[in-house]
């Protein structure tokens, strides 16, 4: 592999030919801010927050897409670069819904963090075109609010490149450009499989999970309700990271105690329903194997996978197990067997 030497802020670094300035900077331990960049997935230079100066060039270049050359000298933190990044951020914010207090991503928003880092207090210098976009709440699990979209196209890449679905894309041009499905269809009318990857990569609150916290509090406060909760096996080993604990810390005891203190009457582990799933799927497999049913038998543990199969590979539907997912099985058990055992009216 051919290697080239690049100097970034006076630090010499050797990287493979064809690397971008951003990749070279990371190797040199130099941070360059980005908003639209996702390595190998979304490298389009759309946000222009990663602009840098290159010695001998008149204008600035976007570090996420511009390739390095042997002997290149790059400057990432000059006054000119800082002013350009700040102006680009102000322009993005001038057309952005700045209702941060009511945004689900407040405090965990990449745009908000960069605005703070660059000392942006207002956008009075610019009069952006603030379009009125309807909020799409048609899907059961998520909503889309284009007034908070910065057109980074991360969600488009996650849907099309990572997942291979391609439900959403950039519609219209100019100030009317926005992310939407084909023919502006609501999300529940598309072939979206509810994978949630667009939510994961969105840097703002433009795409987010629906929040049922208020409904949970209402249920906990209702003296006529017996409220139970189930926790997935993975949560006990991942929840601790949200509280800066080492990766993999088992917080099951703390989690159960916290749920009980919140007011839940019972806390159950979905492990139990996973055992039921194993027994049900094994029984179904034996029945198909001995009675001549459709093989192979494919698990149906993930509703998202089932929807993906039904939408894109309907020819495999006969191979899907008829069993519910562990989460769904527990819901059924809680409202039947458990309710009867406890003398409750579900």
PLM segments and residue spans:
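Eukaryote-biased recognition of intrinsically disordered, low-complexity regulatory segments
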Residues: 1-11
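Structural motif corresponding to the C-terminal cap of alpha-helices
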Residues: 163, 202, 338-342
């Amino acid at each position: 592999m051919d290697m080239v030497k690049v100097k970034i802020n006076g630090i010499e670094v050797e990287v493979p030919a064809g690397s971008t300035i951003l990749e070279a900077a990371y190797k040199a331990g130099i941070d360059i801010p980005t908003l639209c960049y996702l390595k190998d997935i979304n490298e389009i230079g759309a946000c222009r927050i990663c602009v840098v100066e290159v010695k001998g060039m008149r204008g600035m270049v976007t570090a996420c897409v511009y390739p390095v050359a042997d002997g290149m000298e790059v400057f990432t933190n000059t006054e000119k670069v800082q002013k350009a990044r700040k102006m680009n951020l102000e322009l993005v914010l001038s057309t952005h819904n700045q209702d941060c207090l009511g945004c689900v991503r407040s405090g965990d928003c990449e745009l908000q963090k960069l605005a703070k880092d660059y000392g942006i207090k207002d956008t009075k210098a610019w009069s952006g075109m603030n379009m009125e976009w309807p909020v799409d709440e048609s899907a059961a699990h998520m909503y889309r609010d284009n007034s908070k979209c910065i057109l980074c196209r991360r969600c488009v890449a996650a849907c099309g490149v990572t997942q291979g679905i391609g439900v959403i894309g950039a519609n219209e041009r100019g100030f009317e450009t926005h992310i939407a499905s084909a023919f502006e269809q609501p999300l529940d009318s598309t072939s979206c499989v509810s994978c949630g990857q667009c939510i994961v990569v969105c840097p703002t609150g433009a795409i987010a999970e629906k929040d049922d916290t208020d409904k949970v509090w209402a249920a906990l406060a209702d003296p006529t309700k017996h409220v139970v909760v189930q926790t997935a096996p993975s949560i006990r080993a991942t929840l601790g990271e949200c509280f800066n604990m080492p990766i993999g810390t088992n917080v099951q005891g703390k989690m159960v105690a916290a749920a009980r203190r919140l007011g839940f009457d019972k806390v159950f582990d979905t492990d139990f329903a996973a055992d039921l799933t194993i027994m049900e799927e094994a029984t179904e497999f034996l029945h198909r194997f001995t009675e001549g049913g459709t093989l192979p038998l494919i698990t149906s543990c993930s509703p998202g996978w089932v929807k993906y199969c039904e939408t894109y590979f309907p020819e495999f539907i006969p191979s899907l197990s008829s069993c519910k997912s562990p989460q769904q099985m527990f819901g059924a058990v809680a409202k039947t067997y458990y309710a009867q055992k406890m003398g409750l009216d579900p």
